[in-house]
Structures are given as structure tokens and as C-alpha cells.
Amino acid sequence: MAQALIGRQELQPSVPVEGAPSYAKGRVRLWFRPGFHLDQDDLDERWQANTGERVEDVLFLSKHAAASGRPCLTVHPVGVPHLNADETPPYGGRSGTAPPPSPRLAKIWQSLLVHADDPRIPEFEVSLEVTHHGPSQKAPAAFLEVGSTADTWGHEGAADVWADVIISLLKEELMGGSTPAGPPHIPVLVTLGGGHYAPRANQMAALEGALLGHMLANHSLPFKRNEDGTVHGPWAQAVDVALDASRAAHPTRDVVVSLDRKSFRGWERRALFDHLEGRHVQVIDTATHRTMLDGP
């Protein structure tokens, strides 16, 4: 992916950072890091310490591994908000935390969808994934991935498609400017429930103008219920972290939640509704979301 970007001659060689090659143009930087991304915590602060440049957003260009082995291009936020502080995350990050999702997350997804039938990737699917794995950092982040096995990680067509998406997404930043923010009435969507490939978010974030925050699958919302009916478990912590981090990515906007209701048991839904009501967070369906995007 990175080589495909460099091949477009948009980015020029710059000064190595931490001994690793870097490239630059306008306000965009490309950093070739050795090894795995997942355990590289605080890359934003490390970059700033070495260059003096404050990091606005981090897009990780990465491989994606899946047991299914199906060829796919995926994008997702990062974090492990559902883990207790005494748990060791199996794939990086800091337990009970999540960086803000990239404010460009929905735009990345919408741009990727344009290439769903691209002849360069006839065998590939495209999809969002829910929030998962590390690394940890303060700046917003998203992973842009090629999956799902060694047979497809080096696929030239997939790398070219991602290069197209990134250059289109960052065209203003490559020229030294900034992409204008969307209308102020548009809320940030957080989704709760469903499976790993975020079917609800795939649909809702595809709409023009949509903004997307964290997405938590059922496996990241662990519920427990006592014999007396009281509900506990790290699900509430995970929800709070996802909401707060999504708001941090879009500090002037409202955050709304959409639930995959059928994926929860009745008592889990009630606990979620009560918790979100206590936080004054609106729960919406797809029709309401469309109305919100249309404007007041």
C-alpha cells in the first residue's frame, strides 16, 4: 500500500524518524515503521517529539488476517474499551481505552465503497470492521487494511485502490490545506451490537454526509446478570469509552447511537437504554439517521 502511494510521486523522501524512512508532501506524512503496528504505542507523541509536528490523525496501512481467508479491504477504528485494567490485551492497546476514531472514518468508507466493483480487485469484498486491537495513542486513528492471507496481502490491485482512496481523501492536505468540515448539524454515529464486520455501520455510514465513530460488536459488550436481576460487567465502561472517544474526534458535534436490537437479549437492551438515557445520548434508527443527515 505504501509503495503504491510512493509510486504516484505524491510524496517525496524526507528525514528519517526513529531511524525509519519518512516521506512528505503538504500536511501529509508517510512513516515506514518496521515490525507490527499493534504494539507501537504512542506513535503520535513519538513523531512530535522527533519532528516538532503535532499529529492530527493517524491512518495505519496494514495487513488484515482472518480465519475465513476471504480477500477483503477493510477499515476500522482501534481500541480495547471492554477489557478490565488488569487484563492484558492480546493484540495490543491499553485495556479499557480507545483512541478517538479518525474523523475521516466515514469518508474513507464511502470512498472505498466507490471501488466495490473495481476491476482491479474482482475477488475482493469491502467492509468496515468494528473497533478492535491496538496500538494506543492520543491522536485519532484508523486502520486501512488488505486481507486476509499472505496470498492477498501483496495484491497490487488492492494496493492501487487504497492509494486512490487515500490520495482522494487527502487531496487538500497534500496541497497544504484542510478538507472543509461538513454541516454542523450532522451527528457522529456510534453503533452497538452485531458482528465483527459491522453490518449496521456499513449501511448507515455509507450515506452521503454521514460521520462515524466507534463501533462495538456484541463480543466487546460483555454483560452479566446477578440472581437479583442487577446487570453488571464491562459493557458500560466500553460504551462510555466509545462515546467519549467519538466525541473527542468531533468535539463540536452531537453523538448518537444505533443499536442492533436483535443481537441483544431483552434485559441487555433495557440496561443499554437506561445507561444511554442517563448520559443524555439519543438512540436512533436508520430512518431517523437519514432525516438527521438531510438537515434541520
Each PLM stretch: what is its role?
Residues 6, 208, 212-213:
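Local beta-strand/beta-hairpin segments that build beta-sheet-rich folds
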Residues 205-209, 274:
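Short secondary-structure boundary/capping segments
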